[in-house]
Design a protein with these regions (language model features):
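Short acidic, glycine/Ser/Thr-rich loop/turn "cap" segments at secondary-structure junctions
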Residues: 59, 92-100, 118-124
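Active-site/acyl-donor-binding loops of N-acyltransferases
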Residues: 59, 122-188, 243-245, 253-254, ...
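"Short basic amphipathic alpha-helical interaction patches in structured regions
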Residues: 77, 87-92, 107-112
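Amide-forming acyltransferase catalytic core, primarily the GNAT-like/NAT-type
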Residues: 13-75, 81, 88, 142-275
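Conserved acetyl-CoA binding element of GNAT-fold acetyltransferases
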Residues: 87-100, 277-287
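Conserved acetyl-CoA-binding loop-helix of GNAT-fold acetyltransferases
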Residues: 95-117, 289-301
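Acidic/polar helix N-cap motif
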Residues: 8-11, 99
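Extreme N-terminal starter segment of soluble prokaryotic enzymes
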Residues: 2-4
C-alpha cells in the first residue's frame, strides 16, 4: 500500500535517481549522483532552519509504494517571516516531482495535500511550472501574479538579440556569430537614436562592497515597511550568501552597497553576471525616494562590467520605477504560488506588500542543479 512519509537521509539515493529521471529526461547531462546526494543532504538536513531543531514538524515528503519504491517527492524548507512584526511559520517547497509512470496514481496531488495540511502559516514556492501551478490552484492555493513578473533591462541590445537567436538552433547560431562583430556599431547607433533607453547608464550614488554585517543591518531596517517580510539572523543570512557564492564562478557575484552624498546608506543590490553577459539580480533594495538612483547604479555597474542585460523579479512596490527606467516586463512563468488559511497573510500578498527576492525562495536552492 502506498503512503506519504517524511524524507530521511536513507531516501537520498532514490530521490536523486528520481530527480535525474524527471528533470534530465531529454538528453541533458545531469549532475553526478554524488554531487546531487551532497546537495540534497545539505539543503534538506543541514540548512540553518532544519539544524536548529525548532521546525521538526515541517519536513520534506516522499511518496512510497508498497514495495518501498519512492515515486514522488516534494522538498520543503522551513523559513521564518514576520507579519506586521509578528513571527509566522513559512514553508518553501521545491523539486516537486513524480515519476512519469506513476502520475496516474495522483501521487503529486496527495503530496501537495499533505504539504498544505502542515503546521505552517504560509506555503510558498517561486519556481513552479505550468503543471505544478495547475495542481496547486486545484487544491486551494493561488498564483501570486504580482510576484511572478520578471523585468529585463537591455544594456547592449544587439548582443542580447543575437544571444536569443543563438539559442534557437544551429543555423541561427552561425548567423549570430557572423553578425557579432557588428554589435558595437549597432549598439552605438541605438544609443544615439534612443539615448534614454540604450545610452550609457549614469550613476549618482557612491558604492562600496557590501559585506555581511552591512547586509544584515540593512535587511533588518529597509524592508520594515512591508507587511510580510523575511526574518533573518546572522546564521541563516550568511548561509544563504555562502551558497550564492558557491554557485557563482569566481567574480560572478557582485554585492554593492550604495550611499548618498551625505554618506547615508540608501540601498544595495546583489547580482550574478554569467559568462555570456546576462546578469541575474538576486536582490535589489532601496529607499522609496532613492530607488530610481539605485536602479541607475545597478545598470551602470552592469554595463561597466560588460553585461548585455540585467533581469530579476519585480517588486510590485516599485513597478513604476522599473518602468520609468525602460525595463521590459514578462509574466509567463516560473510562477510564484502561495497557500494560507490566514486572510491577513493573503491580503499582504495580494496587495503587493510582501518582501520577496531570490534569496527567499527556491531559485537560489535549485540553481546548482540546472
Amino acid at each position: 500500500m502506498s503512503s506519504i512519509r517524511p524524507f530521511t537521509k536513507n531516501d537520498i539515493p532514490q530521490v536523486v535517481n528520481l530527480f535525474q529521471k524527471v528533470f534530465f529526461n531529454n538528453g541533458q547531462t545531469a549532475p553526478s549522483s554524488s554531487n546531487l546526494s551532497a546537495y540534497f543532504e545539505e539543503t534538506f538536513f543541514h540548512s540553518p532552519w532544519t539544524e536548529d531543531g525548532t521546525e521538526e514538524e515541517i519536513r520534506s515528503l516522499v511518496y512510497e509504494t508498497g514495495d518501498g519504491a519512492i515515486v514522488g517527492f516534494i522538498g520543503i524548507i522551513p523559513r521564518r517571516m514576520l507579519l506586521h512584526g509578528r513571527p509566522i511559520r513559512t514553508a518553501t517547497s521545491m523539486h516537486f516531482m513524480v515519476e512519469p509512470g506513476s502520475r496516474s496514481t495522483l501521487a503529486g496531488v496527495q503530496l501537495l495535500k499533505t504539504f498544505f495540511s502542515g503546521p505552517q502559516d504560509l506555503s510558498l514556492t517561486d519556481s513552479a511550472g505550468a503543471l505544478g501551478r495547475k495542481i496547486w490552484e486545484g487544491l486551494g492555493g493561488a498564483t501570486a501574479l504580482a510576484y511572478s513578473i520578471n523585468w529585463v533591462r537591455l544594456l547592449r541590445p544587439s548582443r542580447y538579440v543575437l544571444r536569443l537567436l543563438a539559442r534557437k538552433n544551429m543555423l541561427l547560431r552561425l548567423f549570430a556569430a557572423l553578425l557579432r562583430p557588428l554589435c558595437p556599431i549597432i549598439d552605438a547607433m541605438a544609443s544615439c537614436a534612443l539615448p534614454h533607453r540604450f545610452g550609457k547608464p549614469v550613476a549618482s550614488l557612491q558604492s562600496k562592497d557590501l559585506d555581511q554585517e552591512t547586509l544584515l543591518a540593512g535587511i533588518a531596517q529597509f524592508p520594515s515597511s512591508y507587511a510580510l517580510r523575511p526574518d533573518y539572523d546572522p546564521g541563516s543570512l550568511f548561509w544563504l550568501l555562502a551558497k550564492a557564492d558557491q554557485l557563482a564562478r569566481p567574480g560572478e557575484l557582485r554585492k554593492v552597497a550604495l550611499h548618498n552624498a551625505d554618506g547615508e546608506m540608501v540601498g544595495w543590490y546583489l547580482y550574478e553576471l554569467s559568462a555570456d553577459g546576462m546578469g541575474e539580480v538576486l536582490q535589489i533594495v532601496g529607499r522609496r525616494k532613492s530607488f530610481g538612483e539605485v536602479l541607475d547604479h545597478l545598470f551602470y555597474h552592469g554595463w561597466k562590467n560588460g553585461a548585455i542585460a540585467l533581469s530579476g523579479r519585480l517588486d510590485p512596490k516599485f513597478a513604476q520605477e522599473f518602468s520609468d527606467k525602460y525595463c521590459f516586463f514578462n509574466c509567463g512563468g516560473p510562477w510564484t504560488l502561495t497557500h494560507s488559511r490566514n486572510p491577513e497573510i493573503l491580503q499582504a500578498i495580494y496587495q503587493g506588500d510582501m518582501f520577496l527576492t531570490r534569496l527567499e525562495g527556491e531559485w537560489l536552492m535549485r540553481r546548482k542543479n540546472e
